[in-house]
């Protein structure tokens, strides 16, 4: 508290204005969140002048780091020209052309811009139902697709409540009845459900639940692709996180599994708001204007004040242009791999039962009491056990976050999200602070050494 008097004052003001005191659930933090005023590269600074190496990176949107000069210049130049032209513009075409060049499922398809990833997933679900004429949606437990009604039914809820059939309030019964939530990576449950239900689509995070916290693996994706194709079920990859991060073409490029539709966000906008759906022409064609009798009764409408907003398009073009040069991913993946290995070495050296992991090299998770086997969830029993261990991590991870923040490191809960601006010295200092923080937690009895 003594290092953050300015944040304390701002939080007290915020509590009078916002019901939850913050503007995003993930930013809620006890005793208060930190309030930042500027950021550059891998660093950010709070209102009290404290400097942090940042591992939130705009919730994963900033693969190029904060205020990248090329992206910033593009956005500033467009702001001078106008932030909303109320008309079509060339930047939206260039932006879509880059998405097409990068994303395998879009290369012979269409792109449709939205204002957020949540909007993109909503549109993908609607397109799937309209195209197939079927009603049911399969999603996987703990996979996040925005806060919209269809896919929020289980996310961040007590898993025992979900298994007992208790859902978040405010979601209509009809919506709940149209969604089938299955255990992650359980291909047998998928086969059985598709055989017995009116399934329009399957949606998932291809890198795994919650930004890859609970991993998905290539063999499952390959089987899922085969089953959905054989049964005329639309496969949707939610690549809001993995798009342009796992590889230039996202998880679908990395795993070699091409979905029918993909949803995008975060990196797409270069740090500015934006989302998109991309994929098959016959499905996306439902958005088209046609002079066919009765077409207007079948057509999917898509208004949106900030669709392909020029400011986001300018920043997104600049960001994707740098990714297309091919220099971003070798650099960030190499750094992430070394960073993950180093964190695991720390766990081993100071005898703490912990694990660092990640399905993409540039997002690294840490947890206590996890093993590699715990990450291989393929049925409801494995999922329940994984969630039990995750629940046990809540308190020690909160203490770890506080210890790291007080040392000038800002992790995003249990995850470290890297950018190309994280230098070797940033990572080395983070590793040292991680070790010091673990030792502090061990001294205070929050975590303990593993037994021989």
Q: What is the role of each PLM region?
A:
Residues 1-452:
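Conserved N-terminal phosphate-binding loop of PLP-dependent enzymes in the Aspartate aminotransferase
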């Amino acid at each position: 508290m003594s290092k953050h008097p300015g944040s304390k004052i701002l939080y007290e003001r915020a509590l009078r204005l916002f019901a939850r005191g913050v503007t995003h659930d993930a930013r809620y933090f006890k005793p208060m969140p930190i309030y930042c005023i500027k950021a550059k590269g891998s660093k950010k600074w709070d209102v009290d002048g404290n400097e942090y190496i940042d591992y939130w990176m705009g919730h994963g949107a900033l693969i190029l780091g904060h205020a990248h000069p090329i992206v910033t210049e593009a956005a500033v130049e467009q702001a001078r020209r106008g932030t909303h032209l109320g008309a079509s513009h060339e930047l939206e075409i260039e932006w879509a052309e880059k998405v097409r060049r990068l994303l395998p499922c879009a290369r012979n398809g269409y792109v449709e811009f939205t204002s957020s990833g949540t909007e993109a997933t909503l549109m993908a679900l609607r397109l799937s139902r309209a195209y197939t004429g079927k009603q049911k949606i399969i999603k996987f437990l703990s996979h996040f697709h925005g806060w919209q009604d269809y896919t929020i039914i289980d996310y961040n809820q007590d898993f025992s409540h979900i298994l007992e059939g208790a859902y978040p309030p405010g979601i209509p019964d009809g919506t709940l009845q149209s969604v089938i939530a299955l255990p992650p990576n359980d291909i047998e449950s998928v086969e059985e459900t598709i055989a017995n239900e009116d399934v329009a689509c399957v949606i998932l995070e291809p890198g795994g639940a919650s930004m890859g916290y609970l991993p998905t693996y290539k063999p499952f994706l390959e089987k899922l692709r085969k089953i959905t194709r054989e049964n005329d079920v639309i496969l949707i990859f939610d690549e809001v996180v993995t798009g342009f991060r796992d590889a230039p073409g996202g998880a679908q490029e990395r795993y070699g599994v091409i979905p029918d539709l993909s949803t995008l966000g975060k990196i797409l906008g270069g740090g500015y708001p934006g989302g998109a759906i991309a994929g098959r022409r016959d499905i996306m064609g439902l958005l088209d204007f046609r002079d066919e009798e009765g077409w207007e009764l079948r057509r999917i409408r898509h208004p949106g004040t900030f669709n392909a907003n020029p400011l986001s398009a300018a920043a997104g073009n600049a960001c994707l242009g740098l990714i297309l040069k091919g220099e971003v991913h070798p650099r960030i993946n190499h750094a992430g791999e070394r960073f993950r290995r180093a964190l695991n070495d720390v766990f081993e050296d100071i005898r703490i039962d912990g694990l660092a992991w990640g399905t993409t090299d540039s997002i690294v998770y840490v947890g206590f009491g996890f093993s590699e086997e715990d990450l291989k969830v393929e049925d409801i029993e494995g999922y329940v056990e994984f969630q039990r261990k995750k629940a046990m991590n809540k308190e020690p991870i909160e203490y770890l976050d506080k210890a790291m923040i007080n040392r000038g490191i800002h992790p995003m809960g249990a995850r470290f999200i890297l950018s190309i601006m994280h230098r070797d010295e940033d990572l080395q200092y983070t590793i040292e602070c991680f070790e010091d923080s673990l030792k502090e937690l061990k001294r205070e009895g929050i975590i303990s050494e593993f037994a021989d």
